[in-house]
Amino acid sequence: AVLTYFVGFNDSMIPESERYDAKETVKSVASSIENNEAVAMKFYSPADGNVVPLTEVSDQAFSSEALGKGIAVRPTNGTIVSPIAGTVSAVYPTAHAYGIKGNNNEEILVHIGIDTVKLEGKYFTPNVKTDDIVMPGDLLATIELDKIIEAGYDPTVMVIDTADSSKRNVTLLAKNTVHAKDDLVLIESI
């Protein structure tokens, strides 16, 4: 429900066959943690650009880490790629956000821009669909970066681990400038 409120959609906008149950995924990861199974995830950069700590993005839902821990990149071009290997679990109708279930059952959110849901898909072209298999660096979407900025929106791309953030440590693997698919962050269970 919190995710629905902040990213601006509801389940009725996604066909039943394309919905995923993030709560079940979070329970699965939490169970692994409780059983002392190590959970470590490396996120690769989703874009060429500048690294921004998640706590410094201009949207409180992300900067407070209420949606989970992660990292952000302010893109310098319109190519957005997958930061992990996995299966696309959701492509939002406005093409500004993507859910990916990783090969180790991690569930991540790739959210393109701040309040860009208000663009209603304008300037976003999805290049994947639900149930597609992706590898780090595979094209998720192309965006018209200049037009998003001209429309007054911050195009920062957030990559969020949606599991219980109180049980996660984040280690930055890159600072300043990155290229798509560069090592970006390591998130480990504690």
Where do the language-model regions lie?
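Contiguous, well-folded functional domains in the mature portion of proteins
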Residues: 4-190
